[in-house]
Each structure stands twice: as C-alpha cells, then as structure tokens.
Amino acid sequence: MAILSTVPALLFALASWAPTVAAQSAADYFVHELPGAPKEPFIKMHAGHVEVTPEHNGNIFFWHFQNQHIANKQRTVIWLNGGPGCSSEDGALMEIGPYRVKDPDHLEYNNGSWNEFANLLFVDNPVGTGFSFVDTNSYLHELPEMADQFVQFLEKWFAMFPEYEHDDLYISGESYAGQHIPYIAKHILERNKKPGVKTPWQLKGLLMGNAWISPKEQYDAYLKYAYEKKLIEKGSPIALQLEQQWRICRTSLAVTNTVDFTECESVLQKLLEQTAKVNAKGERECINMYDIRLRDTFPSCGMNWPPDLVNLTPYLRKAEVVSALHIKPQKTTGWTECNGAVGSAFRAPNSVPSRDYLPDLLKEVPIVLFSGAEDLICNYMGTEAMIGDMEWNGGKGFELTPGNWAPRRDWTVEGQPAGFWQEARNLTYILFYNSSHMVPFDYARRSRDMLDRFMNVDISSVGGTPTDSRLDGEQGPATSVGDIGKNGTSADAETQKKLDEAKWKAYYRSGEIVLVIVIIAAGAWGWYVWRERRKRRGYSGIMGNTPPIAQRGTTRGLEGFRDRRTGRDVETGDFDESELDDLHVTTPTVEMDKDRYSVGGDSDDEPHDEKPSRSNGGRSGR
C-alpha cells in the first residue's frame, strides 16, 4: 500500500508540473497585441516571467523586442536600469525601446529605437524590481548572488528561445547598472569556460551610461562637478559645509572597498538641500540631480523626472497591459518605477565595486562608457577620473605612450555637435553634449548611432540611407538612423530560416515533454483504478486498516500550501488561494486570508501620493 498511497501525490505532482512545462515555450510569451501601440511598424514581442528561485517565489520579468532588420549578423542587446531596484521598463518605454508613452492610454513609435539592428531584451533585475517579484524576506543583498541569479535566468530564457542563443550578445544599461553589468559579464565569461558547457554565449561588448562603477571617484566628483558647473561657489559658507562632509566621506572610503557609503551620500543630499531656493510661486525648489538645467520641487530634486513618468505608471498598471505582458497573478501589486524595499536591501556590504573587474573584462570584452554632460548624480567627471586612474591592457588611462594620450575626436550627427569619442585598448569613452542622466531619453537617434558603431553594423545588405555621423569630419562606417530600404526585412532569408528552425525545435521539445507527462499520468491512473477495483472485490493488502488514500494525501497537500504562506511577500499573497481553487477535493474547508490586492492598485512599497518615487531607503535611485 505504500506505493498505492503515492499515486494521488504523483498524479497531483504531474498535473501541477504539466502546465509549468507547457508554459516553458516561446508561444506562451508571445504578445499578441500591446494596448495603445501604433499598428505600424509591426514589432514582434514576447514578455512574461521566468522563475529563478521556486523556493522563494522568485520570478524575473522580461520584455523582448525582435529586431526590425538583420544587418550582416544577429545581435541581442540586454538592457538594465539602475536603482538598485528601478525597472527596465524605463528603458523600454522612455529610452531605447521601440515605443514612447504618449499619454496614459497610447504609445508612439520611437524613431531612435535600438531594435533596428538588434533584438532587445529588457529585464527587471534584481527580483522584486518592476514586474519581477519574490518573497519580501528573500530580496538580494550582494552583487555576486545577483549575477548568479541573472545567469540562471539567461539559461532558462535561452532554453525557451534557442534561436537567439548564438547571437552576438551585448549588455547595456545606466546608472547603478554600472555595478550589475560587469558582475554579470564576469559570471558569463566564467560560465563559458566551465567544462561541459554546450553553447558558450557570444559576449561581444558592454555599454554603460552615466554608470555608477567606482564609488571613490564618483563621490569625489560631486563637489568638483558642482564647482565646474557653478552650482556653488568655492569658499562660500555652503561650500565649506560640503567640504567638511566630504572629508568625513573620504575617511570612510579609505577604510573599506565597498559600494555604498552613507557618509558620502550625505554630500549630495546636503548639496541639494543647501542650494534649494524659493521660487516666485513661494515653492521651495532644488536642482534636478539628473539634469542640472532643470529644477524640481524640494525634496524630490529630480525624482519626478523625466516628464514621461507621469504617463508611464498608469499605462503599465492598466489591466489590459498587465494581461498582454503575461504578468502572473502572484504579482499582485501595481508596477512602480523603483522599489524602495529592493534598494534598501541591496546594500552589497560584502561586494567590491565593479571597477575592480574592469581591467580583466577589458582583456576579453570591448566596453563603452558614455555620459550625459548635464547629469550630477553619476557625472562624467567621476567617470573620467576613474578611467584616468585605471590600468588595463598594458597601459594607464587613455595614455598611448608616456605623455601621449588618445585624442578626443569631435563627433557630429546630422551636422550638429553631438559630443566626443576617446578610445584605447578595448575601452571607448563618449561624452554626449547637452544630455542628462538618461542619454537615450534626450537623444535616441544619436545613442543608436553609438550602438551601431560599437556593434560594427554593416547596412550594405539592408539598404536605406545612412546617417551623417562623423568623427573629426570623417564619415566612418555606414550606420542608419531610419529610412531603411524596402528590402530591409528580407535582406537575409537564410538567417530567418535558421531562426524559424530553432524556434520550432523548441516547440517540438516542449510538446514531447508534455506528451511523456500525459502518458505517465494515464498509466499511473490506470494502475490506480485497477488496484481500487481489486479492493472493492475483496482484495486486501497488508495494511488493511490504512485510511483512504485521498484523505491522507489531501490533508498533507493543504498543509503544504498553508506552510508556504508563512513569511510570504504581500505581492504573492493570492498565490495559495488561486492554487487551492484548482484542487477539487472533498475535505473540510480551511479558512484562508481573504485580503485581495489588485494589480492596478498602489504598491505597498511606494508612498501613497500622486507622484512616483525613486526613493531607496534614503538613497537617490541611480
């Protein structure tokens, strides 16, 4: 009877497993229609959750946009926003994605989208960010565990979308993603070198914008940038206060080599506070830390920026959008730009700054660091100081030979000064003139020109009009900012054929797995029915007085669901009830918590006001 008693459990496990396995195919993630999006051009999308830590209900959300054209090879760009804890839907709908939010109900096409020649994969990272979710007692704390989990996500994602696994892979992002990206790249390279890895991922480059990489230089740059931009005057009472706070910060920096220093964060906070003024309306306003040309109400100081944010949040909370993006019901709170609880947990006290890994990464992977000149919080002076102090590939900084530095090449796009490029030994630095913390928000087409140059895009097989992009007056490679020729989408039929073959192989594999499950379940059920009939005919086993199987198995299953509720995230509060609704058993009813949370409602992690916040436990969201 021991074997017999396991049959219901086996059947239940198989029944539970079958939908899970069946969902692990690209078809289930296909976005059939995105509410409010323009009909043309057609953009193929997939979106949804990938479970990474079942024991903690950890699910990472992704949103994938297929490229519009294939130029000489297949490429995929992964995009991450910063925070930590800020959603990559910022990048998808306010920066490099194919759409921008026009109003709370409508999107419009972004003519500078990065998906012209590259597939785009936006990921809400780490768990708990954006549409991703996890139990609140399981937020991540360190950079290595984040990178491990991200590689797990990619393993599962490529298993579902094998047609992209051989693409040239690029990882890009901004702000605190300057910590995430080098760690992820390091873990990918280590993964590729492990014995038994069937498909090494073709990591071809990293792009980081206004990136928080080296705390030492970046914290030091707050005051230097404020002086350079005349936000404060040297020797003034405000300057003397800030200099005193900087000395406290510098003492802390000398003691430990970590990422986050409260004493140093205070330098920026005091700068914003001391420079705040009362405007003509009698309102106290301060410098926008993400774009010093702008002002914001105090103490937001940039948290309400960019202006698209006022439409982005209600759009992503619309029930039809949530449904279209396949958001799991376990994600019961509405989308928020930045999750303060995630940011507060992710202090990385035992992680070294990602700057420490750049020299080794540059031995294997080209890197682009780009900066908007008007950003304060992750300003270009800190990035330039870090580069100047760093040694890699046989040299220090951009020095080519003693006393001879790599030139800064003037960059113009469509006849307008765009910035400058500087490069040496696998590292490229680009300064964008008149640009904020979110460079692609200001200059989407210019940022895509940067990407296409970095990826060595060759549009000769595509057709269309190349952009007039020049370095020191030289035209350079032919990249495009739009106006693609009519033959663009069919330029590489052979490549598309290979993609389709890989996709259908994945579908067949999923179908085979489900078929095996059905066969096993049918066999187990048949055996179980045969045993029950023999019992009714008078057959008795050794354990004749054992309680009925259904009674024993069901009680244990309900207790299991109840146990999983303990310490659960409010975001996953409905999970147990929705699972139990599908259990058609005749047992005493268990009283469950009746609170319900709407996906379209306010997040428990955000303040209940009209404006979204990037606040991360006292830190400014990067």
From Swiss-Prot:
Residues 24-509 are lumenal. It is a single-pass type I membrane protein. It catalyses: Preferential release of a C-terminal arginine or lysine residue. The active site is at S175, D375, H437. It holds the Pfam family Peptidase_S10. Residues 531-622 are cytoplasmic. Residues 1-23 form the signal peptide. It is an enzyme of class 3 (hydrolase). Residues 465-492, 539-622 are annotated as: Disordered. One of its GO terms (biological process) is proteolysis. Residues 559-571 have a biased composition (Basic and acidic residues). InterPro entries: AB_hydrolase_fold, Peptidase_S10, Ser_caboxypep_ser_AS. Keywords: Apoptosis, Carboxypeptidase, Glycoprotein, Golgi apparatus, Hydrolase, Membrane, Protease, Signal, Transmembrane, Transmembrane helix. It is found in: Golgi apparatus, trans-Golgi network membrane. PROSITE patterns: CARBOXYPEPT_SER_SER (PS00131). Its EC number is 3.4.16.6. One of its GO terms (cellular component) is membrane. The chain crosses the membrane at residues 510-530. GO terms for molecular function: serine-type carboxypeptidase activity. Glycans are attached at N111, N426, N434, N487. Protease with a carboxypeptidase B-like function involved in the C-terminal processing of the lysine and arginine residues from protein precursors. Promotes cell fusion and is involved in the programmed cell death. Belongs to the peptidase S10 family. This is Pheromone-processing carboxypeptidase KEX1. The gene is KEX1.
